[in-house]
């Protein structure tokens, strides 16, 4: 499958540490702009198919995602985008084929091992924010760090940094219901990134937001992942994100293929 790459256009200012991290990330590319082949793939699907009874959702999917890439998967509703993300996360099993996440074959892991891999190495951003209403903003962000055994002082420091970068430094002690939809999604992004996962899976992250807010959230997610060198795989129907992505793929008739720009 031929890769199509574009440069991110426009967007809000990026914190200096994110720019610095992007410079480091850029040096991992070869002179042609392609990722160096020596780097281990973060995600690899080989001939993956998924069917429910007689209904084939995905057929013969081949996909390779390298560290730090931003890959967007588009397609009509019901085309299998969410199913593909669930397979990558090990939340569902393929009918055939192999899925490797961070070099590990998901089918060879126990459920406990898959759960640990998700907890330590994956971050999730969904259409619905799923913030815990009885916890403050700061407590919501710190939750995945607590689950990963990160020291309280370090967790507090990371939380303060994320809130500052989100321009929400004054919101740490507020509760989710006090925030707008766009603000809640920003907090959901911070929570997904707090434990510094290797891969973030985003499923329609702007589905409940107005166009302007959606654009801001997409740019924030892109900047934050690039700043941490995090691989981002996003399923969406939004055309706004195409200019931000390294690659855009589409699911059509159960097959994954290069999307038209």
Regions picked out by a protein language model, each given a short descriptive name:
Residues 2-49, 257-261:
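ABC-family P-loop ATPase nucleotide-binding domain
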Residues 248-260:
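H-loop (His-switch) and adjacent beta-strand-loop-beta switch element
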């Amino acid at each position: 499958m031929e890769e199509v790459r574009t440069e991110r256009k426009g967007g809000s200012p990026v914190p200096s540490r994110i720019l610095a991290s992007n410079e480091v990330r850029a040096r991992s590319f070869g002179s042609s702009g392609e990722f160096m082949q020596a780097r281990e793939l973060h995600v690899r699907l080989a001939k993956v198919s998924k069917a429910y009874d007689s209904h084939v959702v995905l057929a013969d999917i081949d996909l390779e995602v390298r560290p730090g890439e931003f890959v967007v998967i588009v397609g009509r509703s019901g085309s299998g985008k969410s199913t593909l993300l669930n397979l990558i996360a090990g939340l569902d099993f393929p009918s055939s084929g192999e899925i490797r996440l961070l070099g590990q074959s998901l089918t060879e892991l126990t459920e406990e091992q898959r759960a640990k891999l998700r907890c330590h190495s994956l971050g999730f951003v969904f259409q619905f924010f799923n913030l815990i209403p009885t916890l403050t903003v700061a407590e919501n962000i710190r939750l995945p760090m607590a689950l990963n055994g990160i020291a309280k002082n370090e967790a507090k420091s990371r939380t303060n940094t994320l809130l500052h970068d989100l321009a929400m430094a004054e919101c740490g002690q507020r509760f989710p219901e006090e925030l707008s939809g766009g603000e809640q999604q920003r907090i959901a992004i911070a929570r997904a990134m707090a434990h510094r996962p290797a891969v973030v899976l985003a499923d329609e992250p702007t589905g409940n937001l107005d166009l302007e807010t959606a654009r801001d959230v997409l740019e924030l997610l892109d900047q934050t992942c690039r700043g941490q060198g995090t691989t981002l795989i996003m399923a969406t129907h939004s055309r706004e994100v195409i200019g931000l992505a390294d690659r855009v793929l589409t699911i059509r008739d159960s097959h994954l293929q290069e999307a038209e720009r």
